[in-house]
């Protein structure tokens, strides 16, 4: 089997996530494109893809619905956001600081903020890999892109409690 068979061919997002924030829309679009271009996505016990992924919310949890390329259901995984609370809040504050600094700060300040943002992103991606490992194996880059997508989805729904605490 080639590595190309264990990848995402479609990423769909729950349409109830709405925003008018162009930064969030751009982050989301880039994450989806990156996932479609290059991802390692291996549902445990499944023999090959490519795969379709739909991310939604149910009862305050993220739900990853995984299907094969023809749409046949493989597995759904409900993921609690509680372990991500601190990282999501830190990442949110860091991103806001970065956006503000783009208008007011020098290059060194932007680089320092970006280094901190990348560190938080890496930590969150590793946590995501661990939390998904019972149902799907993903590489570091796929985990980073999925975390970006989760952040963008929650930021779109700015009333979501996880980003308010």
Curated annotation (Swiss-Prot):
Keywords: Plasmid
Pfam families per the UniProt record, alphabetical: UPF0262
Top-level taxon of the source organism: Bacteria
Family statement drawn from the similarity comment of this UniProt entry: Belongs to the UPF0262 family.
NCBIfam families hit by this protein: PRK02853.1 (NF002769)
Protein's recorded name: UPF0262 protein y4uD
């Amino acid at each position: 089997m080639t590595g190309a068979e264990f990848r995402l061919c479609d990423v769909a997002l729950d349409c109830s996530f709405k925003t008018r924030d162009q930064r969030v829309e751009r982050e989301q679009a880039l994450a989806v494109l990156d996932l479609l271009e290059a991802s390692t996505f291996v549902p445990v016990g499944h023999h090959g893809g490519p795969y379709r992924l739909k991310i939604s919310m149910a009862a305050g949890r993220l739900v990853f619905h995984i299907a094969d390329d023809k749409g046949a259901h493989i597995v759904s995984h409900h993921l609690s956001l509680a372990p991500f609370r601190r990282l999501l809040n830190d990442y949110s504050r860091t991103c806001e600081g970065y956006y503000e600094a783009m208008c007011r700060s020098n290059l060194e300040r932007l680089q320092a903020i970006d280094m901190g943002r990348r560190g938080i992103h890496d930590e969150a991606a590793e946590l995501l890999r661990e939390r998904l490992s019972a149902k799907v194996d993903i590489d570091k880059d796929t985990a980073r892109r999925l975390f970006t997508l989760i952040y963008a989805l929650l930021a779109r729904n700015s009333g979501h409690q996880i980003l308010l605490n």
